[in-house]
Amino acid sequence: MAEVFVLNPPVVKDFCRSARWAARSRGRVQRHPDWLLTAVAVLEQAGFEVAFLDGAAMNLGRQQVSSALQTNRPGLVVLHTTTPSIDSDLTYGALAKELLPDCKTVAVGPHVTAEPEDTLNRAKGCLDVVVRGEYDFTLRELAELAGSGWSRSKLAGILGISYVDDEGQPVHTPARPYLDVNELPFPAWHHIDPRWYRDAGKRFPFITLISGRGCFGRCTFCRDVPLMEGRKLRMRDPELVVDEIEYCLSRFPYLKEVMFETDTFTASRTHVSGVCEAIVRRRLKIAWSCNCRTDVDLSLLPLMKRSGCRMLMVGFEFGTQEALDAVKKGTTLEHSVRLANEARRLGFTVHGCFMFGAPGETRESALDTIAFAKSLPMDTVQFSGICAYPGSEIYQEATTKGFLIPNRWRGWVDENWEQATVLSLPELSKEEIDGLIDQGLKEFYLRPQQILQMARAIRTLDDLRRKIYGLRMFLDGGLVSCDVNKPS
């Protein structure tokens, strides 16, 4: 039995909940539930017995979740939620109430943080509390309350939550101050097996690590970081970060790679150099990758390479300065060119992230983004439409101007639960964006020089396996036959 049951609910096969854009990705990526397991570790550190079930990664069915609930009979059930899956997620709150009428149910995640009242209304009594923002310490307080006598009057004293009072009216307690990231324990990785998670771009098996929270950026398309983590950069002590790497390697000695999922890993020179120097000093032999801004201090790259950094996941975003400025990215095309060239010179693998759908964007500017991506020395790319999630600045703008397509949360994914284009602009329609995504991938990957470069990058059997997997996903997406320039 467990006092607290934390569920990453299943949706459909290969649905990735922990990604920035929750959906089934074309590459069928599955990401580690690092945030959830950090909260689990906080609960366990406080002495609670916790059961954790990653129904999404394990592709579990409703009956398996039901059996786990009945076996553990928790007093508190915690549900992770996403925008497209919110209605499905809430059915597991109803299931918990049906099986365990006395249990309390709590929802966490960016979607419910952005839409607490809508969530409570949809729940129709199957949800007791919505936690807004960082939930690590909030869940600990709710678990204490569940064990000592739950009441709405006591809920009023817990910061950062929303619930319905005795009159049926929504109550939103004051926001919780952002926590000290150095107080957080390492994620409770003993609840999962890293081999459940996959990404063709990473060496298998890999694990994710978050070295800080918050971001000073003002990107209008970003939802999760400003909503959940705030606008202030809070980086963990570099020695603590490398302690976590050592912990992961001791627990899972077969790991091939560590992925720093921190959105702003390269934003602080002091943090990056501290982490790299500690890795070198401790003689850790592990490849690692990270998210990277284009305005990173280029003098850091040699040290990053020496400490084992293999791949940079770079948010280039657009190929015109007008589009970058329209989404308040705070970077320039010159930053992009300099970083890509220096990374290639030093031997990094570079994955470029590009988007379509900036305010004021046209077909011509979108084609400029494709051309710009092809001009940069990169190994892999992704193209997507801007995913205007509730809680983001661009969502508010799109809603006000009538550019937003979905009229229900399920509309953020298509009929196959893959990411859907949700914007249709005056000079760039949804259909054009969909076509441009496929055209960009086709034009980038089917160039002879790109095919040759990718073949040259195959040095191990693991490299070959990842390339074959990626190629299969590429072909399954129907990209080879796509051409948006064909007459309709």
What residues fall within each predicted segment?
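Short, electropositive alpha-helical surface patch
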Residues: L60-V65, L69, S273-I279, T362-M378
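Radical SAM enzyme core and accessory elements
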Residues: A2-V6, L69, G75, D166, ...
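N-terminal [4Fe-4S]-dependent radical SAM core
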Residues: P10-A19, A23, I158, Y163-T208
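Conserved C-terminal portion of the radical SAM core fold
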Residues: L76-L79, K104-V106, V242, L249-E261, ...
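Short catalytic helix/loop segments, enriched in acidic residues and glycine
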Residues: W21-V40
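Glycine-rich beta-alpha loop elements in corrinoid/cobalamin-binding modules
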Residues: W35, A39-P177, G385-G391
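Residue-level signal for the nucleotide or nucleotide-sugar donor/cofactor binding architecture
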Residues: L60, E134, R236, A267-T270, ...
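Radical SAM [4Fe-4S] cluster-binding motif and immediate context
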Residues: N182, F186-H351, A358, A371
